[in-house]
UniProtKB/Swiss-Prot annotation:
Coiled-coil residue spans: none
Physiological role: Metallothioneins have a high content of cysteine residues that bind various heavy metals. Functions as a metal chelator of copper (Cu) and zinc (Zn). Functions cooperatively with the phytochelatin synthase PCS1 to protect plants from Cu and cadmium toxicity. Plays a role in Cu homeostasis, specifically in the remobilization of Cu from senescing leaves. The mobilization of Cu from internal sources is important for seed development.
GO molecular function, one term: copper ion binding
Entry similarity comment: Belongs to the metallothionein superfamily. Type 15 family.
Tissue: Expressed in vascular tissues of all organs. Expressed in root and leaf phloem, pollen and root hairs.
UniProt keyword Metal-binding present: yes
The species this protein was found in: Arabidopsis thaliana (Mouse-ear cress)
Keyword Repeat: no
UniProt keywords, alphabetically: Metal-binding, Metal-thiolate cluster
Pfam families (alphabetical): Metallothio_2 (PF01439)
Protein name according to UniProt: Metallothionein-like protein 2B
């Protein structure tokens, strides 16, 4: 998530909002105050899948707040 001086994040319609909110691509998860505890056992991952984690795209998809608290560039989807 990008911030503009720690106080601005790109909000809806590519306009800057309050807080460090990034692009707010997941608004339903934005302000949740719940905890989830997952218990269980999973099989060990083999090396074929371990390297694939490096290919994820950044969450804000190049959406950053500039020095004047405007999104620059903003490609929110």
């Amino acid at each position: 998530m990008s911030c503009c001086g720690g106080s601005c994040g790109c909000g809806s319609a590519c306009k800057c909002g309050n807080g460090c909110g990034g692009c707010k691509r997941y608004p339903d998860l934005e302000n949740t105050a719940t905890e989830t505890l997952v218990l269980g056992v999973a099989p060990a991952m083999n090396s074929q899948y371990e390297a694939s984690g490096e290919t994820f795209v950044a969450e804000n998809d190049a959406c950053k707040c500039g020095s004047d608290c405007k999104c620059n560039p903003c490609t929110c989807k």
